[in-house]
C-alpha cells in the first residue's frame, strides 16, 4: 500500500503527452483527456488550490485544453520540474463544503455553466427546456424545464451552492 508522500498538486493528477504520443490518440481519447484535465483542475481549484498555479501546468494553459488545443510538451521538457515556486498544498475542507462541491461542477466558463444547466435538466427528464440569458449570461442564466426537478432531501444543499456560485 502506498503512503502519502506530501501535498497533492496539479502535476500529481495531470497526464502529459509528447507530440508523438498525442498524435497517436484518436479524437475520442483527446476529448476524454480534455474532460479529465478540466475536471481535475476544477476540483483542485474548488478545494483551495491556487488558481494561478493550477491554470498553467507543464507548459500547457488550462484555457488551451478548454479550447481543444493540443496540450503536448516537447520530449524531455518538463518545465514545472524547474519551477522556482513549490507546489501549493491542498488543505482538507469541511463536510459542508464537500457536499456543496459534490452538488455541482465548478464553473470555469459561461459555456460550461450553460452546458451543465441543460444537462441537469435532461438528467431530470425534461423534454422542454427554456434558456434565458441576460447580458450574454453575465447578469443572468436561467433554465426552465418540465423535468422532475430535485428530490426534497437534496434541496437544502443546492440552495447554498447556488447562492455561492450565482455571481459567475
Swiss-Prot record:
Query: Pfam families from the xrefs?
Result: HATPase_c_3 (PF13589), KRAB (PF01352)
Q: Which InterPro entries match?
A: HATPase_C_sf (IPR036890), KRAB (IPR001909), KRAB_dom_sf (IPR036051), MutL/Mlh/Pms-like (IPR038973)
Name a GO CC annotation attached to this entry: mismatch repair complex
Gene field: PMS2P3
Q: What else is known?
A: Encoded by one of the numerous copies of postmeiotic segregation increased 2-like genes scattered in the q11-q22 region of the chromosome 7.
Name the chain's protein.
Putative postmeiotic segregation increased 2-like protein 3
Source organism per UniProt: Homo sapiens
Molecular function, one GO term:
ATP-dependent DNA damage sensor activity
Q: Which PANTHER family match?
A: DNA MISMATCH REPAIR PROTEIN MLH, PMS, MUTL, MISMATCH REPAIR ENDONUCLEASE PMS2
